[in-house]
Amino acid sequence: MSRRVAVLVAVVALVLACATSGPALTSSWRAPETQRLQFHRAMTSFVTTDSGLRRSVEDRMATRIPGSFPAYSAVPNLSLTNAARAREQLRGKLFDGAVVVRVIDVGDAKVLPPGQGWYSADPDFASYWSDAWKGEKARTSPAATTGVAVEVVIYTLGNDQLVWAGRTEPTTGSRSVEELVDRSVDVVMRELRSTHHIR
């Protein structure tokens, strides 16, 4: 695992821990061989069908994660339905890492709860990317901001492997999706820095 990959993992974990009054990180996992996350170029992506919200969140994520760029502007025609094509497009733009954030409904029977190996369901970028976007497109209304959690996953694109995953605790108070994601990313980044996955 390269040093850049290790740094990126650390940065994202730290993002999930910074907010003093924000959500807490309830579960996280890292690949055993991952010591520090360091990517040359990492893509940030927020899974939502709301294009304006996606741009706003991806822009803010890119300011928090060193060496990262928002997917919507770096690869405007990035495939959301064909994971193999998406990975090919990203590699073509010299991306070697992907940080993907999505809001999940903890009441959804398809969402595995923390502590039950939820992160093992998608060990590679291709499977996660496809599942995440298919699930989002199936929503009939925007995600609520109460009773949901934020999930952050980091993949290396070179060998198409999951290197870090984390989820926040379910929200109990209503807040905007942007605020929820902002605070969650802060929590992840703090976690990543505290565990020395990033500097």
What are these regions (language model features)?
Residues 18-39, 49, 130-199:
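C-terminal/domain-edge helix-coil "capping" segments
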Residues 1-18:
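Sec-dependent bacterial lipoprotein signal peptides
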Residues 83-154:
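Surface-exposed short loop/turn segments
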Residues 5-8, 40, 97, 146-148:
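Residues at beta-strand starts and edge strands
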Residues 38-113:
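N-terminal segment of the mature soluble domain
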Residues 12-15, 36, 92:
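Alpha-helix termination/capping residues and helix-transition junctions
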